[in-house]
């Protein structure tokens, strides 16, 4: 996942690896708090929606510290939408259907 995040954020070298690894873990926990199933959000997932959400979260947080607040706001808006969609989608949550 670290390599995917670095590629998406156009980060080369290893200077930010520790910080990005922390952000990846934080993204997974944030999705879990929103109700996304922990089995779905493992950081070795191949699920495109989870990967995109984690990358977007990392972009939003990384831009706050090292980039543009405008870009950070755009990433945050996108991440919040992705998180909301995932937290309401069958197959991504632990919620069961009520009859």
Model-derived segments and their meaning:
Residues 49-51, 55-99:
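Short loop/turn elements at secondary-structure junctions
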């Amino acid at each position: 996942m670290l390599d995917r995040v670095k590629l998406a954020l156009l980060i080369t070298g290893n200077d930010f690896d520790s910080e990005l690894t922390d952000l990846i873990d934080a993204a997974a926990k944030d999705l879990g708090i929103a109700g996304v199933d922990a089995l779905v959000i493992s950081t070795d997932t191949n699920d495109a929606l989870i990967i995109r959400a984690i990358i977007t979260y990392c972009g939003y947080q990384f831009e706050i510290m090292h980039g543009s607040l405008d870009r950070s706001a755009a990433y945050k808006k996108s991440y919040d939408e992705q998180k909301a969609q995932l937290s309401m989608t069958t197959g991504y949550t632990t919620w069961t259907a009520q009859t």
